[in-house]
Amino acid sequence: MVDQIGRDGELIHDVDTRLSNGRKDDLLLTALPGAVVETFAGERVVRYRDQIILKKQITHLGNPWPAFKKRIQIPKRWLTVEARARAEGLVVRFVGIYNYRDVTIFVDFDPSTYVLRKANNSAAHVATNDLHQAQVVGQFSRVDRNGNHLTSVRDDELSRYLLGGVAPEDPRLEVFRRFNAELLDGCEIAALEAVQDMHAAGWPDRFQAEWPGFYLEYRFDAFVRAGSMLHLVEFQKDKRRGRYDFDLVFRSRLSVDYYGDLKASDIVKHESPGNDADDIRRCVEEYGRFWYVIYEHTTKHSRDNGDVATIAWNEWRRSVGHKGRKEFDPLSYARKFKESVRFQRMMILEVNAANFEVVLGSFRQGQQPDGAERALKVMINKRYIDNFLIYTEPEPIRLV
């Protein structure tokens, strides 16, 4: 069984389908009034105005790959067609066709990566979430982990898309784009400088040992407040009764559209701890989606530099009146304390009904002091990012 998408964007487990060449042509001709089938540079294509459409069916990669991984095969002869069309001033599209029952989605793969590859066949990949997004919102564009650009388009939107009618972007993405311009500046952030900034602002978690995540929260909260952006995104530090216990509230005017969580993660880690699985599931069921906004950083540990930063941090906490539960120890948290971090990359991951079970690998996080098991948590597995990636910055470098 593989992932399939239903009419409302829901996930269905079923066998893969197979389309004949004639059926693929019919699906394109139905979506593009005025298009014709013709032969161009020896290849059967669909011609739509000044555009040459080369098409393949989107299918699952096969075992042992996860059910969400899909692709089209790009034959080497497409490169000849692309070169000829470009020489004649025509636009070439490498299009994948997904069809399941009454759902048809087209995926436009930017040819620029694939024309540079020397192999006889290349694979262009797409994930279940790309299909879900297109079915729900009409058009969805992203850059995958290898730097490839792809746009998924519902069948009733294809003509508008090919003629330049791009769907408007979610305005909340611009909030993060502007924040990234400040945070992802390549500068190293020293621990003592960060905690002193939080202390000056009265930030509640200024004394916490895992300071990078709390510093990220502090910076983002200050940014959206200073920029009067709370009507789009609010950082929810003080959780209120009756509301979900998540960091981010995404709004449309006074109403809540959905929730999210803001996380800092070491760039070398393959996974990032998430939230209670039941809470995420309820949130997705109520609002349709949940966003994880992850900022990855490189790390310098104090233990690799004589614990100087650890001692300075502990001394500073004592100097401003902080009293721990144990007797003062200048080497408290020495094994894990981060001397500095450099935020280098951010990504927005969407959890929804089509990827909930795959995007998050569940795990049990030990036991309570009384021996009872802790609530089931979720783990963000970075290997599966392409099945829930909404936005990333900076864009990955293309692999040729």
Functional labels for PLM-detected ranges:
Residues D247-R251:
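Short glycine-biased active-site loop of nucleotidyltransferases that positions the nucleotide triphosphate
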Residues V2-Y244, L254-Y258, A264-V400:
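Nucleic-acid endonuclease domains
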